[in-house]
UniProtKB/Swiss-Prot annotation:
GO terms for molecular function: alkanesulfonate monooxygenase activity; uracil oxygenase activity. The FMN-N(5)-oxide reacts spontaneously with NADH to produce FMN. Requires the flavin reductase RutF to regenerate FMN in vivo. It comes from Escherichia coli (strain 55989 / EAEC). It is an enzyme of class 1 (oxidoreductase). Its EC number is 1.14.99.46. The gene is rutA. InterPro entries: Luciferase-like_dom, Luciferase-like_sf, Pyrimidine_monooxygenase_RutA, SsuD_RutA_monooxygenase. Gene3D superfamilies: Luciferase-like domain. The keyword Oxidoreductase applies. This is Pyrimidine monooxygenase RutA.
C-alpha cells in the first residue's frame, strides 16, 4: 500500500466547517464494497441493514443512503449478484428509525417520474419528513438490456438531458401536485400526485463528469463524489472545487459529500494488514467484468464515476477513497477531509459494517474536531 507523502496540516476555518455531516452507504448488495474472497462474505437482508442504520442513528450519523443495482459482476464472490430494492428497503428503514435522514436511489430508466414522486411522498409520510431521493442515470448497460429497456448507446451522451426532464416532472408534482410537462422524453397530461411531501423533497446526485456536475449545480441539493487514493484524504479537492465552481454559475450552494471506506484497528500496522489481506484476495473475474463495463461508454468523457471505479489502482473496493489506520489516524484524516472547501460531508462504507460503525462511534468519532458538536451518547444501541 502506498500512503500519502507527508501528512497535510490544516486549520478548520470556521464553526460551519466544524460540523461535517456523516452518512452510511448501506450494503444493499452482497459483500458491501469489497470485491475480495478475503473480505466478509454476506447476503443483503433487511435485518442486517436495519441493525446498521439503527447503530448509525445511535451514533448520531446524519443520513443513510442505499444504491440500486440490478445486475452484478459475477466472479467467485458473485459480487453484487444479490441485491435488495432501494425504495422498499428504505421505506422499511424509515419505519424503524426516528432521526436519521433516509435516501433511496431511483434508477430513472426503470421508473417513471410520476411513480417515483408518489413513492417518495409515501416514504416522506412514513419517515415524518426525513426522506430524499438520489437520482442515477444508469451506466451498466446489461442491467437494462436484460429487461429490454436499454434505450440504445446514444443514451450515454443524452442521459443528463433525460434526467433534466425527469427532475422537472418531479419538482412539478412535489411542488404543485400537478404536471403538464412536455419534453423529448416525457409527456405529462394533467398528471396528479397527492398527498404531496410534508417538507421540500431533497434531490441528490453523484455527478463527476462536467455534464453530471452541471446537472447537480442546477437541480441537486448536494453532490456525491469519490474520495481518491489510500490515506490521501484531500486528494478529491479538485473535484470539490469543480462542483463549487459549477454551483457558482447557477447561484446555488451545492456541497460535495465524499465517499470513503474506513478500515481501522488499534494500530496503523494492524489496519494495514487487513487492507493488504483484502487486496490479496481480489476477485479478478468480477473485477474484469467491471473493467469491461466501464469501457462501454465511449461518449461521456474520462471523468465519469465508472471510469474511476474500474481504475486498477484500488479496484478491490471500486477505487473509493480508502482510510486505513488506527482510530486516531482515521479521525485525523477525516478532519482533513473537512478542511477542503466545498466538502460538507462524507459517505462511509466499512469492511465490516456492524463492528465498523460501532468502532467508528466509540473510538473514531470522539476524536474528530469536525464532530465535536455532537451530544454525548445516552442510550444503548440494539
Amino acid at each position: 500500500m502506498q500512503d500519502a507523502a507527508p501528512r497535510l496540516t490544516f486549520t478548520l476555518r470556521d464553526e460551519e466547517r466544524l460540523m461535517m455531516k456523516i452518512g452510511v452507504f448501506v450494503p444493499i448488495g452482497n459483500n458491501g464494497w469489497l470485491i475480495s474472497t478475503h473480505a466478509p462474505q454476506y447476503m443483503p437482508t433487511f435485518e442486517l441493514n436495519k441493525a446498521i442504520v439503527q447503530k448509525a442513528e445511535h451514533y448520531h450519523f446524519d443520513f443513510a443512503l442505499s444504491m440500486i443495482k440490478l445486475r452484478g459482476f459475477g466472479g467467485k464472490t458473485e459480487f453484487w449478484d444479490h441485491n435488495l430494492e432501494s425504495f422498499t428497503l428504505m421505506a422499511g428503514l424509515a419505519a424503524v428509525t426516528s432521526r436519521i435522514q433516509i435516501y433511496a436511489t431511483a434508477a430513472t430508466l426503470t421508473l417513471p417520474p410520476a411513480i417515483v414522486a408518489r413513492m417518495a411522498a409515501t416514504i416522506d409520510s412514513i419517515s415524518g419528513g426525513r426522506f430524499g431521493v438520489n437520482l442515477v442515470t444508469g451506466w451498466q448497460k446489461p442491467e437494462y438490456e436484460q429487461m429490454g429497456i436499454w434505450p440504445g448507446d446514444d443514451y450515454f451522451s443524452r442521459r443528463y438531458d433525460y434526467l433534466t426532464e425527469y427532475v422537472q416532472v418531479l419538482r412539478d408534482l412535489w411542488g404543485t401536485g400537478k404536471s403538464d410537462f412536455k419534453g423529448d422524453f416525457f409527456t405529462m397530461n394533467d398528471c396528479r400526485v397527492s398527498p404531496q411531501p410534508s417538507v421540500p423533497m431533497k434531490v441528490i446526485c453523484a455527478g463527476q463528469s462536467d455534464a453530471g456536475m452541471a446537472f447537480s449545480a442546477q437541480y441537486a441539493d448536494f453532490n456525491f463524489c469519490f474520495g481518491k487514493g489510500v490515506n490521501t484524504p484531500t486528494a478529491f479537492a479538485p473535484t470539490a472545487a469543480r462542483m463549487k465552481q459549477a454551483a457558482e454559475q447557477t447561484g446555488r450552494d451545492v456541497g460535495s459529500y465524499v465517499l470513503f471506506m474506513v478500515i481501522a484497528d488499534e494500530t496503523d500496522d494492524a489496519a494495514r494488514a487487513k487492507w493488504e489481506h483484502y487486496k490479496a484476495g481480489a476477485d479478478e473475474e468480477a473485477l474484469s467484468w467491471l473493467t469491461e463495463q466501464s469501457q462501454k461508454d465511449t461518449r461521456s468523457g474520462t471523468d465519469t464515476n465508472v471510469r474511476q471505479m474500474a481504475d486498477p489502482t484500488s479496484a478491490v473496493n471500486i477505487n473509493m477513497g480508502t482510510l486505513v489506520g488506527s482510530y486516531a489516524s482515521v479521525a485525523r484524516m477525516l478532519d482533513e477531509v473537512a478542511s477542503v472547501p466545498g466538502a460538507e460531508g462524507v459517505l462511509l462504507t466499512f469492511d465490516d459494517f456492524l463492528s465498523g460503525i460501532e468502532t467508528f462511534g466509540e473510538r473514531i468519532q470522539p476524536l474528530m474536531q469536525c464532530r465535536a458538536h455532537l451530544p454525548a451518547l445516552t442510550q444503548e444501541v440494539a
